[in-house]
Structure formats: C-alpha cells, structure tokens
C-alpha cells in the first residue's frame, strides 16, 4: 500500500457489519483528516447457508473467511469483526491488530409478549443459534424449547414478529448499534447468563506486514477493552473453543487488577463447569490460560471432546 492509497475495508453486507465498517471508517478519518477510506462489500458463506446450524457447517468462521482471502489477495486492507464471531486462529500473515471500545456485552431478551425469561410459560419456544445461550437457558429453564434462529438482526426480529417464537435472545450491542434498543424487553445480566468471548467489542484484522496501516489504526485501540478481550480469548484458545461451542466468559477491570469468570456447558444444560480467577492486569493472558486449564480439569474436557466428536 502506498502512502496515498485509500484504505479498503472488507465487510459483509448485513446492516450490523456495515455499521461496524462505517464506524471504523469514521474513526480512522477523525484520527487522520483527509485519509481516504473505501468499503469493499462481499457475501460470505455464512450469509448464504441459512438452513443449517452453524456448528454443522463450520461455525462463525464462515463469516470471516472470504474477508481474509480478500486481504491476503490484496483486494482489501482490513476487515472489521464483531469479536464474538472471530475464530481463535488467524491465517498466516494476518492478525488482530486493534480492538475498539466495548459496547454493552450483555445478551438481550426480546419478545412481543413477555418481559423476561421468568415470565415465559412452560414449554415456550425461544430462538437462538448459540449453544452458549442454549445451555444457560436450559439450565435455568429446562422446560423451554430452543429453536434454531439464523439470519441478520432484522431477519431474526421478523421471525419473532411472525409468531415463530415466544422470545429470542440477541446481543444487546447489535441492537443498540442498529438503534433497535426499544425491542429489548430486558437485559440478561452476566450473573444469569455469561456473554460470549469478546461480546460487544469490535476488532480490526489486517496484514501483519502492513506497517503503515497498523500505525494508522493505533488511535482506535482501546486498552481497557483490549486487555479484557485478550484475557477472555486466551481462555478460549486454551479450551480450543470454536465460535459454536457452549463457552461463556466475562471479565472486569479494577485498577491494575482483572477478574475473569467463565463456563463450559453441555448443550442441553444438564452439566455446567464454572470457574473464576483474578490477578494483575498485566498477566491477563496467563490468567485466561490458567482458568481454562482449571475448567478442563473440572470436567470441561469431557464436554468439549464429546461435542467436537458429535460435530464431525
């Protein structure tokens, strides 16, 4: 990339993906007035395959592969991701270089009839495509019927409005970003249901040899968010957790200290392995690894081994 070349952002065409791309474009141009930034839109396999559970067709990595190929082939310079959708591994030559300030990491309960999970009647139908949400919902309410829910935010809300579900669970951050917060009947606190790794944060991936771009992106990095997400992702990497596994985590900062809580669950909610750890913020990555190993020793290894065997 030459010093005068425009920055090209690879993005999916969904409203939320475009919001994230425009957010990064605007932040780059605010930090570097006069900088040219273009969007390169594309359709990914994850956008096309809507009739099969994600876990059976490759997980949420389906949403990023085409963007990564575009960067490796020089058709785009960076890609913007919702951190909860980013696989733990990157192709050679690419990496996560910037994490922007985190939005609300909680899940949101959305319904046209009921205000919260407790109000749902026996056998109510709840929509989600997340095994993490499914296992925590079923642990709390084993009577619920969990029904697969795919598509972008608007599509999911449309299916709720068509009467296919009594309620659906979505990421609060996505609804807020799309100015759909009025659809949220209640927030599901981390104490009741742990969010996904990195939920609510936006990350930027680019070629690791693109020194000019990495320098331009520096002002967009949010250190507090980056430390929290680093801790959560280190835990997930050690668990070898893909994006479609029942793993939840949530971290908080307190001055120079960081606290991490995590869980691994059976998809049907019948068994949950939980743990938490705290320590110095500078040791965030090591703390995530330590907690993951504790979870594995406490029973998570058996849950994950069985799950991966079933998905093959």
Swiss-Prot record:
It is an enzyme of class 2 (transferase). The modification S-(dipyrrolylmethanemethyl)cysteine is found at residue 243. The keyword Magnesium does not apply. InterPro entries: HemC, Porphobilin_deaminase_cofac_BS, Porphobilin_deaminase_N, Porphobilinogen_deaminase_C, Porphobilinogen_deaminase_C_sf. SUPFAM superfamilies: Periplasmic binding protein-like II, Porphobilinogen deaminase (hydroxymethylbilane synthase), C-terminal domain. Gene3D superfamilies: Periplasmic binding protein-like II, Porphobilinogen deaminase, C-terminal domain. Pfam families: Porphobil_deam, Porphobil_deamC. Keywords: Porphyrin biosynthesis, Transferase. One of its GO terms (cellular component) is cytoplasm. Transmembrane segments: none annotated. CDD domains: PBP2_EcHMBS_like. Binds 1 dipyrromethane group covalently. Belongs to the HMBS family. The porphobilinogen subunits are added to the dipyrromethane group. Tetrapolymerization of the monopyrrole PBG into the hydroxymethylbilane pre-uroporphyrinogen in several discrete steps. This is Porphobilinogen deaminase.
């Amino acid at each position: 990339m030459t010093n005068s070349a425009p920055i090209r952002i690879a993005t999916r065409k969904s409203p939320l993906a475009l919001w994230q791309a425009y957010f990064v474009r605007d932040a780059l141009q605010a930090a570097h007035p006069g900088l040219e930034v273009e969007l390169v839109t594309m359709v990914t396999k994850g956008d096309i395959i809507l009739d099969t559970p994600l876990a059976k067709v490759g997980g949420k990595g389906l949403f990023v592969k085409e963007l990564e190929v575009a960067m490796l082939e020089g058709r785009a310079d960076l890609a913007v991701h919702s951190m909860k959708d980013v696989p733990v591994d990157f192709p050679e030559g690419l990496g996560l270089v910037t994490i922007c300030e985190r939005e609300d990491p909680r899940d949101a309960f959305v319904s046209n009839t009921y205000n919260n999970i407790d109000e749902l009647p026996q056998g109510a139908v709840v929509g989600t495509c997340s095994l993490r949400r499914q296992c925590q919902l079923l642990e709390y309410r084993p009577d619920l019927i969990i029904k697969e829910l795919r598509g972008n935010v608007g599509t999911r809300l449309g299916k709720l409005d068509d009467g296919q579900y009594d309620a659906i669970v979505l990421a609060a951050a996505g609804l807020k970003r799309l100015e759909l917060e009025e659809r949220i009947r209640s927030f599901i606190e981390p104490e009741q249901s742990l969010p996904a790794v990195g939920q609510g944060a936006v990350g930027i991936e680019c070629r690791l040899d693109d020194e000019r771009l990495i320098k331009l992106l520096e002002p967009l990095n949010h250190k507090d968010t980056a430390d929290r997400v680093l801790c959560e992702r280190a835990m997930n990497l050690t668990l070898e957790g893909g994006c479609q596994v029942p793993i939840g985590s949530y971290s908080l900062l307190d001055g120079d200290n960081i606290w991490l809580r995590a869980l691994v669950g059976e998809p049907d909610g019948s068994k949950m392995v939980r743990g938490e750890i705290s320590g110095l913020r500078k040791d965030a990555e090591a703390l995530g690894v330590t907690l993951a190993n504790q979870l594995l020793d406490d029973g998570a290894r058996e849950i994950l081994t069985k799950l991966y065997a079933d998905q093959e």
